[in-house]
Amino acid sequence: VYISQSAKIAEHVSFGYNVVVEENVTIDRNVTIGHNVVIRKDTHIGEGSVIADNTVLGKTPFKASTSATTDDKLLPPLNIGKHVTIGANCVIYRGVQIDDYVFIGDLASVREDVQIGERTIVGRGVSIENKTKVGRYVKIETEAYITAISTIEDYCFIAPEVTFTNDNYLGRTEERKIHFRGPILRKGARIGANATILPGIEIGEDALIAAGSVVTKDVPPRKVFAGVPAREFRDVPTEQLLENQSYYVGE
């Protein structure tokens, strides 16, 4: 284990083998760190959190010469709240805010300028790109792709292998750079497995997108859309509305 002299480690913190803790890292009490974890400078890990093997925390992004959404700027430190669990082989970048009781599965990647609200679940192999906001009590399931500049409000559900997109120009023309915008999911929206959401689309509160759909236009609240391209199918059943769920705690 390597621990910088400027790091601040509270009581009852356990480390696996080959851990690296860089300058000015702060680790609160009762944190568990697995084997081969790298904690980059200035990172904060809140009380009772668990970091599994081979994970990198606080990574500074590299900018490709042709990247259109990665900024050259000084990012704030990675801040991990209390009782957060981060699985094995994850990469969490600098400039991320993870609130209390978040669960992040193995092999997930969370880019810079991302906020994740309390008690949200980020599944195995999920990618969350930069400049994205994820609310509270959200579930993002295995291998979903959340593109840059997206918004996911509280209580949303995103099934496995859903794809968000943000570039209608598919990498061509300079004009595209002023139009980058990911989807917006309003509170309680649900997206079925393997659905694709095109750039800038807004999915209304409590709306439902059926599995395999391609969403090319905004979806009103409390409506079910299905198909390629997705079209209105029916109203969301009353018993499925967020307000009627036992786990819903309101604002």
Language-model-detected regions and their locations in the chain:
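A glycine/serine/threonine-rich, flexible loop-to-helix segment
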Residues: 222, 236-250
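Structural signal for interior beta-strand "rungs" in well-ordered beta-sheet cores
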Residues: 1-64, 68-226, 231-232
